[in-house]
Amino acid sequence: MERRYLKNPFQDFIGGENTAFASDEEHIKNLICTYVDTILEHCHPNSDDEDDRGDLYVGNAGIAFMFWKLASCEQTRDLYPPALQHASAFIRNAKANAERFKKRSAERYSFLCGNAGIYAVSAAISQAVKDTEELSNDLANFKSGIPSSKEFIHTKNGCDEVLVGRAGYLSGCYWLNDVLPDKKITDDDLISICQLIVTSGREYSKMNNSPLPLMFQYHGTEYLGAAHGLCAILHMLLDSPWFRTVPISAPAAELREIKRSIDYFLVLQDAEGNFPVALEDLRSGRDKRLVHWCHGAPGAVYMLAKAYLIFKEEKYLTSLRRSADLVWKKGFLRKGPGICHGVAGNGYVFLLLFRLTNEMKYLYRAHKFMELLTNSEFKQRARIPDNPHSLYEGVAGTVCFLVDILEPEQAYFPFMDVFH
């Protein structure tokens, strides 16, 4: 069976060398333009394709986010002057598709794969183009997810994870509060959602005799990774107003359960630095270790970084370094250039570590992941994703990664900024 990753073709950073990346800037900008031109050639915002959900994950809202990011970054806003026009066109189409799903309560708080993400990105674009009426409508539609997220403690298939659940909705709330000039989502609303997530995890854990104080399931599987599982849910709890004060304002029981769940997760890290896909893998003895943002260490790093920033315990930084070393060894994925399970998503690990430690080794490694995108072996052996131009599977996400390499001090994986 062919390996999931390419052998790392690069020499690692040599300590003490004076590495300059200025020569990469023109190459990165040219690569951005190439990817953007490809997206515009193959993706049309006025398409009437009924199969186009329009969501952030693989739909037009994700492409709109990419154009918004291009327009928001000092290094790239002049590179593509019509970026906001394209962002507006793609988000209009996404919102037209969202109308078909408005009556579904779960869609209102589904962020990456539902209506909530569409309206969040639209709000940011409306703010950028100074359309106050549309901004008001977008925020009203987005905020309709607050009561919808509280209708149930549990659902049959799970309602807490990042792609379609409450943790994802929280990530959208935090992002909007960061990018809009006034705080649009109140602390009370954020805390009420966090409280419900904790209650859900606590009750599920007790009902299923879980070894963790908080545990969750998605379609019957107790996932641990960022897309559907525990680590991203814990990350969003750590991002809450509970942990933005000194001392921490989380209730004692919630603080204890969150911290113990993080520490249990930490001991699951294997000798290579990776984490299991699901708790079931430990029980069954399956050795399915993936090095993706969605499953594995590349997605776990954001929760670990947030835990390190809050609790200041060295064990979290040690775990982060081990995760990064694993990604450097086995993270040059053949599944494509995307951020969910591709090269750009794994490259983001090093931008995170660079911001956290200010060590040039990690910025050097991020640049090498950028270089792989034009590597002849990668171009020959990488697979074409199902949605090759999208934000999470395709090159729209790659563009975001490249933009962030140009401004590494502000870099963040989409909707998972641990430093805000």
Curated annotation (Swiss-Prot):
Q: What's a Pfam family this protein contains?
A: LANC_like
Q: Which InterPro entries match?
A: 6hp_glycosidase-like_sf (IPR012341), LANC-like (IPR007822), LanC-like_prot_euk (IPR020464)
**GO cellular component annotations, sorted alphabetically?**
plasma membrane
Entry protein name: LanC-like protein 3 homolog
- Top-level taxon of origin: Eukaryota
Q: Which family does it belong to?
A: Belongs to the LanC-like protein family.
Which SMART domains does this UniProt record tie to the protein?
LANC_like
Swiss-Prot/TrEMBL GO biological process terms: carbohydrate metabolic process; peptide modification
